[in-house]
């Protein structure tokens, strides 16, 4: 579309001339590029990404964690961002909006720990830890990768599942913000996710997990 072409041109100018973020925003205003993003999952109080997008003159439509996405919500949208969304996006929505990018922000270093409770499983199975941003397809957390980053934790003997979750949460927000221009202008290289890795369902969580405030080292020692 002309909107996406304009965004791509602006991104190219930014890259060539090293335009700073303030000038980037002004160029968008001058060219009157209307950008609308549908944000699924966390609300404005739970994540800073919605406020960030609005600061870039993006019109943000939101849909809560437990609400079901419908076809009409994707009209005139340039991007759908899923972060903390509780539902699998049905194939008829993806097919209806096949020219539209759907991306998911996932708290694991894909392809490891697809599905539920990725932070817990990364410790329980001693698999790579990190965050990923990937395109959404019909399979759970198996769309092509856009970005991923490994994360290491300091003072692990003092960490809980909740504290490490919070670290990953902030890292994922930072990864999105840092690469925002690439994402919105589609200036990214897709990487196919390996068939290896791991996948877990909610029901797979051990009953020994009472709450997420449990110390990781102590839990692993006793389980």
List each model region and its residues.
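One-carbon transfer enzymes
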Residues: 1-223
């Amino acid at each position: 579309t002309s909107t996406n072409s304009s965004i791509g041109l602006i991104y190219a100018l930014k890259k060539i001339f090293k335009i700073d973020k303030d000038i980037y925003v002004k160029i968008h205003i001058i060219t009157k590029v209307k950008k609308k993003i549908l944000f699924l999952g966390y609300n404005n109080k739970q994540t800073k990404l919605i406020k960030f997008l609005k600061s870039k003159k993006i019109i943000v439509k939101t849909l809560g964690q437990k609400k079901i996405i419908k076809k009409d919500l994707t009209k005139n949208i340039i991007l759908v961002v899923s972060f903390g969304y509780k539902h699998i996006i049905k194939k008829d929505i993806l097919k209806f909006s096949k020219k539209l990018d759907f991306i998911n922000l996932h708290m694991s270093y894909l392809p490891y720990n697809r599905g539920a409770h990725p932070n817990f499983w990364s410790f329980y199975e001693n698999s790579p830890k990190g965050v990923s941003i990937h395109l959404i397809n019909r399979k759970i957390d198996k769309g092509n990768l856009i970005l991923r980053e490994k994360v290491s934790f300091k003072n692990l003997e003092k960490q809980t599942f909740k504290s490490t979750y919070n670290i990953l949460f902030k890292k994922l927000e930072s990864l999105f913000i840092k690469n925002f221009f690439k994402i919105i202008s589609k200036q990214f290289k897709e990487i196919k996710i390996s068939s290896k890795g791991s996948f877990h369902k909610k029901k797979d969580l051990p009953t020994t997990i009472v709450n997420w405030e449990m110390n990781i080292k102590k839990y692993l020692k006793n389980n």
